[in-house]
Amino acid sequence: MSILRAQTLRLRGWAPKAGWLAWRNYDFQLTTYAILLTTFGLAMAYSNTVGSTHESVTINSPFVRSIMWGVIAVVVLALTTAFDYKWLRSFSWPLYLINIVLLVLTLRIGVGTGEAGTAARWVVIAGFQFQFSELAKMIMVVVFAAFLAERQDRIKSPWTILGVLCVLGPPWILVLMQPDLGTSLVLVATLAGLLFMSGASLLWLGTLSGTVVAAIPFVWSRMADYQQARILTVLNPWADPQGAGYQVIQAQTAVNAGGLAGKGLTNGAVSLPVSTTDFVWGVLAEELGFIGAIVVLILFTLLIWRLLVCSWRATEPFAMLLSAGMATMIFFQVVVNVGMVIGLVPVTGIPLPFVSYGGASLVSLAAGLGTLQSTNLRRERPEW
């Protein structure tokens, strides 16, 4: 790809410059798509918490908090864009340890809500709930990218595969213990995508797939009863319409009720559980219709395309893998989240990036986008 070109530039002694001219490399399309998707998320937060329920607007309103998190995300985006992304490569292991500490802390003092009330997924700080597993997704993209970038010359070695699996193991197990099946699947999918795009041996990727299959009994044993029921009813939600199949049935009803143009913002009538997070696309389809739902999917397609363009244009392995990892992570979450709503995949609790309510998710995504913009600004290229 572009790795040999990067090595040639370094041998010639050329170093990237991050001056004002570098801003012509800023990917404004990428940021625009992310902002538009976040705007859809704000609209859904308003509809779910203010418009349809007529709640008073207070500091504790999810809509107001979504705006606050949006402002914080913009600041994080600007800061991470300004910093040289290369420090992340040397700081990846401290980040990994911080990630482990946060996940252990979640198990120790975490709280759960709703159906998953026995799960320890959120840590309450100053009245705000933080889901550190959302941060773990982005941190692990950085860690995987740094690990594989350092081993590009031996990427086909089985020891490289074994090593990165050992890196995945601790956070994956800690997330599964919460239990958070959705995030554990995202971590595995992200790593698999990165291994494939970094040129790992297909033989060893097949071995990795076999390992994942072999781990299914362990994963099943760690799942809560309601999670197992969700999987067992995916083929026929009407087998338990008031229990495990209720969410899928309501989501499909909402999508069908929206029609082509939707019922209008705040006019949704179908009751959906976790309507601001896991099933937000169902609410969006009901209120904004098929047109609105498709527009969101088109925006995601364009966003992922720009991420892949960033990866293609990167001139060194770490930057390339960062972009590819984030593209893989977002793609997997979108496919599974929409699949949950229309009943094609089990309900696993995976949010819709940028659109689902959640401060930790939005801020971590903003940090990821800012880091990718930093790679664009500092792209190694000769001066003509």
What residue spans do the PLM features occupy?
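A juxtamembrane structural motif centered on a specific transmembrane helix
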Residues: 1-17, 338-384
